[in-house]
């Protein structure tokens, strides 16, 4: 990967943004080193252009180092106040600052001084776009703000928070080239000098931090304040953590536990003591950081860097040791970038993808944190990215965070600037919970005991003050560490047997023993708490396992739903686009579940190792508790028992001394004052004895409690050991059971990842075509809009014509209705309103009539009762009149009674006649009243008819409403069917268009297939040719190897012959020497042996000549062997080269075959999609016909319902007219009677009653 040179000048080019001397004398040059002045600047280096003169309101440098006067002038004219708020951090934990960089000379040359943002004040900024967007933040820094001002506003409060014990974090966010690295690091080499204006936030922060630490040490000398600072520097490159201070480390892992929190394992931490040490570490880490050149930034950061400093402080105050610690994170994020703008390719594109992924995860985390701060329960995906996981405490946790959002005012970066402003606006709503990280520890129990003892000592000394005043010869000395005292008696010279030093040592021993016991008990409590915490962790692990099971169940449900949706797609119930979208969502959910399972599996292994470690720790603690601590406790118990015995012995001895003093006092009787002193002395000794006794009892109780706590802790350890063993066994079983599932899930994840990679590759290929077709799409959209408007106008005209035709048809049917449908509807509505008002009036009238009817019914009942009474009286009168006729025979029989009653009978006849006349009058009057009552009955019949007609009118109204609602529902259904028909027509057009595209793509894939086949055939031919050549070479090599074998065999034979000849020659030489010696001794006797010697000499010469020939042959054979070996080596090399070529060609052939298979598969998929499209077109055509049929059916139903509605309206009108006639008749009858009928009937009935009473009275008189 091409990186920029890591020399000092390169670091300056990267982070320095050094100020350069301007040619104009009006502006004062910034002092800097010669090295910084000699560094050359490039016009495309955005960072160097960004903050090249922080002192001069950040004006622009061009290629020659000249200041861009226009930009400087504009920036000066638009400057605002930039000051800190001292009370901000009291109520807030997150601060968001916007920083704008100046325009570069290249941007000014292209677009002038136009900007995409406008600063309104020190807290508000407006994005100039369509539409304008105004944003409000804590602070807004324009291009006039220098590094020093930025540090005073953001860096100084952060250092104060760190010194106060708060975790703090500062990170810069923005697109690439917006000035993040300059803001955070700046000129690092310049930071080593005190007056460098271009050094960034990090060196300034640490310079101020160490000066602040030095001031704290000077102010708090008495408290023995001690600071330690440890620094680490890491980067996150392609989602891998690298240690910038140790380049050999690679792919470090993030860990989380309850002690250290979130930390990087095996990360190098260096202790620093000054700002120079920190700058040195920064320079070392910056030299190892990944940077590369893009179109937008020559020195673009390709990774996120996190510089962490842990500050710890300790001091002692009033016997209590305070420990305060804080973590400071300074983060330089890599900038988000577009492939189109940055021109990233290859490795740069991969880096940009990982950067954008982590930044998008950061944005998602901030969005979910905002939702959480608003009270919603949303999962915050910290673990989706290593950056967010590392900054978990800084985002929504225990930290005070400063976010510096760097933006570019260039119009070409307006969309990126808007995205950064929206990100900062969301981040402003995060709520952190920052607390002071401080711990205080000390011997609180020992201090309490000492305070009690000192109080007792003070009270005792106050009580002894009177004795000291009475006798100056007695000196009393109080010991601060013990309630006992050392007294010197001037007369008898007696003193306590235990000296002050011994008492103090005893008390200290007691205190140390007690403190040790309490500390051990506290450690036991801490150990028990840790074990309970581990138990809770194991329970959480079990819950996570249950969550995994739920996730698997959810995956099964998703699979079932996917199968159902596929069945629906095959059956044609569900469209393909909806199915694909749903399948994509299900796959994303499944991937999330699988990711969570993978994370949980890692956690399971981590917890398993943690459990093993805890087992070992518990075993070790148990062995220590069983072996070492018991011995220590036994020793302490024995020491306490010895001290208790010593105190009791001293008490007994002191009591004997006091008895001896008493005897001496009784014998002498000379020192009265000594007796008083002795009594005081005895009282003090008794107090001391009482104190010792209480202390012994307390020690014994403490020993018993310690023994109990020891036994309880051992039992608890055994119980927890068993619990941990059980949990570990369960965990191992679950891990084994989940092993197969995890493997299957991993395979599924791999396949899904491969599928996603294929899809992303296709999207990348389609991206190029999409860019080309975007303009054509815009033109087509405009044309479609025009066509849609024309279509809407035609539809409106068609609807108007249809309404006019329908109104005309209804005009022929209805005689009274108007010509068009709209007027008919209006008249119908008016008629309905009139009918409603008439119905309300009718209801009122009916109510009044009903009230009158009830009154008439009451009166009628009264009259009927009177009539019945009158009829009863009439019957009685008739019966009375008939009774004298029946009594006449009886009276005639009695002569005496007839004589007496002749006169009375005459009178009675007269009375009877008058009574008959009155009764006849009453009967006539009753007949008249019966006629009047008949009028009431007719009126009642009219009212009943009116009620029936009102019910009928209500029923007709309800029917009319039902028909109207049916008509409205049919209209809505028809509208829906029309809309569905339009959608179906659009889909049909889209399908036809897509089918045409599929046809063109099928042709394209056919061509690709032909090319791939030709490629495969060419490679296969080439491969066959190479294989044939390789076979020829191998056969040639085999022949050479066979020849070499023969030659080697002949060489071996020659070697063996030479050896044999050498042996023979040696034998002949030996024999010749022996025979030569014998010939010199006796030449005469052994003449035959001389001839033999000559023969042997000849044989020797023959052998030597043969040996020479064989050696020559051997030399020639060796030459041939060497030639053969060279040829074989050459052939082997050729074979190897041929094999490598064959392997390469075979790989390329396999790749081409794979490409061919992919093209064939894609072609098949396109054909399948084309077939599906044809089937869908057929289905759409059928659906359109069905919709047309339904719309026609709905129109006919609407026509029928309208006819029924008209008939019901006519019927309602008839009923209404009949009801009105009946009501008018009833009213007329009531008016004619003029409400006097009831009065007349009452008068007539009263007259009848009076007549009946008179008749009855006459009858009584006649009797």
From Swiss-Prot:
Listed GO MF terms? ATP binding; microtubule binding; microtubule motor activity
Q: Which GO terms describe its biological process?
A: microtubule-based movement; spindle assembly
Q: Does the keyword Nucleotide-binding apply?
A: yes
> Where is ATP bound in this sequence?
174-181
Q: Which UniProt keywords apply?
A: ATP-binding, Coiled coil, Microtubule, Motor protein, Nucleotide-binding
Composition bias type Polar residues, residue spans = 35-44
Residue numbers spanned by region Disordered = 21-44
Q: Which Pfam families match?
A: Kinesin
Q: What is this protein called?
A: Kinesin-like protein KIN-12E
């Amino acid at each position: 990967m091409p990186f920029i040179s890591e020399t000092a000048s390169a670091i300056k080019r990267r982070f320095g943004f050094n100020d350069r001397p301007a040619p104009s004398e009006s502006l004062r040059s910034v002092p800097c080193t010669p090295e910084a002045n000699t560094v050359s600047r490039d016009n495309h280096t955005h960072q160097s252009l960004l903050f090249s003169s922080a002192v001069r309101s950040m004006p622009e440098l061009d290629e020659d180092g000249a200041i861009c006067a226009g930009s400087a002038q504009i920036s000066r004219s638009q400057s605002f106040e930039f000051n800190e708020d001292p009370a901000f951090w009291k109520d807030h934990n997150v601060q968001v600052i916007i920083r704008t960089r100046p325009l570069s000379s290249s941007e000014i040359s292209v677009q002038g001084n136009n900007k995409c943002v406008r600063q309104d004040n020190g807290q508000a900024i407006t994005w100039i776009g369509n539409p304008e967007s105004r944003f409000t933040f804590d602070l807004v820094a324009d291009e006039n703000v220098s590094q020093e001002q930025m540090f005073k506003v953001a860096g100084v409060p952060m250092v104060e928070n760190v010194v106060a014990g708060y975790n703090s974090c500062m990170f810069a966010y923005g697109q690439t080239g917006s000035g993040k690295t300059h803001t955070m690091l700046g000129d690092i080499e310049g930071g080593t000098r005190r007056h460098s204006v271009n050094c960034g936030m990090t060196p300034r922060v640490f310079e101020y931090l160490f000066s602040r630490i030095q001031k704290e040490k000077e102010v708090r000398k008495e408290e023995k304040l001690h600071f330690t600072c440890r620094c680490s520097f890491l980067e996150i490159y392609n989602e891998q953590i690298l240690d910038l201070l140790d380049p050999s480390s690679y792919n470090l892992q993030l860990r989380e536990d309850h002690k250290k929190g979130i930390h990087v394992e095996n990360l190098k931490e260096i202790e620093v003591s000054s700002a120079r040490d920190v700058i040195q570490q920064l320079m070392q880490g910056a030299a190892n950081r990944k940077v590369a050149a893009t179109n937008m930034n020559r020195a673009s950061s390709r990774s996120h860097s996190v510089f962490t400093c842990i500050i710890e402080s300790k001091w002692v105050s009033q016997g209590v040791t305070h420990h305060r610690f804080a973590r400071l994170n300074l983060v330089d994020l890599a900038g988000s970038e577009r492939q189109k703008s940055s021109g990233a390719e290859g490795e740069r594109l991969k880096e940009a993808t990982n950067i954008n992924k982590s930044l998008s995860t950061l944005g998602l985390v901030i969005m979910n944190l905002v939702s959480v701060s608003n009270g919603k329960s949303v999962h915050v995906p910290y673990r989706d990215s290593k950056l967010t996981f590392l900054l978990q405490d800084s985002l929504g946790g225990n930290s005070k965070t400063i976010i510096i959002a760097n933006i570019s005012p260039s119009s070409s970066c307006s969309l990126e600037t808007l995205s950064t402003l929206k990100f900062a606006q969301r981040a402003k709503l995060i709520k952190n919970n920052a607390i002071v990280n401080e711990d205080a520890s000390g011997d609180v129990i020992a201090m309490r005991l000492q305070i009690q003892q000192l109080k007792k000592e003070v009270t005792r000394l106050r009580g002894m003050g009177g004795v000291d005043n009475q006798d100056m010869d007695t000196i009393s000395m109080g010991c601060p560490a013990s309630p006992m005292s050392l007294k010197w008696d001037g007369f008898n010279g007696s003193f306590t047997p235990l000296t002050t030093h011994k008492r103090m040592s005893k008390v200290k021993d007691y205190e140390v023993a007690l403190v040790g016991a309490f500390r051990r008990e506290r450690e036991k409590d801490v150990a028990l708490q840790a074990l309970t915490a581990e138990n809770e962790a194991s329970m959480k692990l079990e819950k996570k396992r249950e969550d995994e099971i739920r996730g698997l169940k959810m995956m099964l449900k998703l699979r079932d739903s996917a199968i159902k949706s596929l069945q629906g797609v095959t059956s044609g119930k569900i469209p393909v686009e909806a199915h694909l979208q749903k399948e994509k969502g299900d796959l994303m959910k499944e991937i999330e579940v699988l990711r969570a399972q993978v994370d949980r599996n890692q956690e399971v292994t981590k917890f398993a190792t943690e459990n093993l470690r805890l087992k070992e720790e518990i075993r070790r603690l148990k062995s220590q508790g069983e072996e070492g601590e018991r011995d220590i406790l036994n020793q302490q118990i024995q020491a306490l028992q010895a001290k208790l015995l010593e105190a009791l012995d001293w008490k007994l001895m002191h009591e004997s001394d006091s008895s001896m003093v008493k005897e001496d006092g009784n014998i002498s009787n000379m020192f009265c004052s000594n007796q008083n002193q002795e009594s005081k002395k005895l009282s003090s000794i008794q107090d001391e004895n009482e104190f010792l006794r209480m202390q012994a009892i307390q020690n014994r109780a403490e020993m018993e409690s310690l023994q109990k706590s020891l036994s309880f802790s051992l039992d608890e350890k055994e119980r927890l050991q068993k619990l941990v063993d059980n949990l570990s066994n369960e965990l191992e079983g679950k891990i084994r059971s989940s092993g197969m599932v995890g493997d299957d899930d991993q395979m599924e994840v791999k396949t899904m990842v491969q599928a996603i990679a294929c899809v992303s590759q296709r999207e990348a290929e389609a991206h190029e075509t999409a860019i080309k077709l975007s303009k054509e799409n815009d033109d087509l959209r405009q044309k479609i809009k025009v066509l849609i408007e024309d279509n809407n106008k035609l539809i409106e005209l068609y609807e108007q014509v249809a309404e006019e035709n329908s109104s005309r048809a209804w005009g022929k049917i209805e005689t009274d209705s108007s010509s068009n449908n709209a007027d008919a509807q209006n008249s119908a509505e008016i008629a309905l309103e009139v009918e409603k008002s008439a119905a309300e009036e009718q209801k009122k009238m009916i109510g009044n009539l009903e009230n009158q009817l009830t009154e008439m019914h009451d009166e009628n009942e009264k009259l009927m009762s009177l009539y019945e009474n009158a009829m009863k009286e009439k019957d009685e009168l008739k019966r009375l009149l008939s009774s004298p006729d029946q009594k006449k025979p009886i009276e005639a029989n009695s002569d005496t009674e007839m004589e007496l009653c002749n006169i009375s009978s005459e009178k009675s006849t007269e009375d009877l006649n008058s009574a008959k006349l009155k009764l006849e009058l009453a009967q006539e009057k009753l007949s008249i009243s019966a006629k009047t009552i008949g009028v009431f009955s007719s009126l009642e019949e009219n009212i009943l008819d009116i009620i029936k007609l009102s019910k009928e009118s209500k029923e007709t109204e309800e029917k009319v409403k039902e028909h109207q609602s049916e008509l409205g529902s049919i209209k809505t259904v028809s509208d829906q069917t029309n809309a569905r028909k339009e959608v179906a027509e659009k889909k049909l057009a889209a399908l036809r268009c897509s089918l045409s595209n599929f046809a063109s793509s099928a042709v394209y894939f056919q061509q690709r297939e032909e090319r791939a086949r030709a490629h495969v055939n060419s490679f296969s031919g080439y491969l066959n040719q190479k294989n044939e050549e390789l076979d020829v070479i191998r056969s040639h090599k085999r022949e050479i190897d066979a020849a070499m074998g023969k030659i080697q065999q002949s060489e071996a034979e020659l070697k063996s012959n030479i050896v044999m000849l050498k042996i023979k020659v040696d034998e002949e030489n030996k024999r010749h020497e022996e025979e030569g010696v014998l010939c010199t001794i006796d030449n005469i006797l052994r003449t035959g042996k001389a001839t033999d010697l000559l023969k042997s000499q000849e044989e020797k010469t023959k052998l030597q000549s043969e040996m020479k020939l064989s050696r020559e042959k051997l030399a020639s054979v060796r030459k041939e062997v060497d030639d053969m070996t060279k040829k074989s080596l050459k052939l082997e090399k050729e074979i190897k080269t041929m094999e490598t070529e064959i392997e390469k060609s075979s790989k390329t052939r396999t790749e081409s075959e794979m490409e061919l298979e992919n093209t064939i598969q894609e072609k098949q998929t396109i054909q399948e999609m084309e077939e599906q499209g044809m089937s869908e077109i057929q289905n759409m055509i059928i659906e359109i016909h069905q919709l047309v049929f339904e719309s026609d059916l709905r129109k006919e139903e609407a026509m029928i319902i309208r006819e029924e509605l008209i008939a019901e309206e006519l019927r309602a009108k008839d009923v209404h007219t009949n009801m009105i006639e009946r009501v008018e008749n009833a009213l007329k009858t009531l008016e004619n009677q003029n409400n006097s009928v009831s009065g007349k009937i009452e008068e007539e009935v009263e007259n009848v009653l009076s007549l009946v009473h008179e008749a009855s009275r006459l009858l009584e008189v006649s009797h």
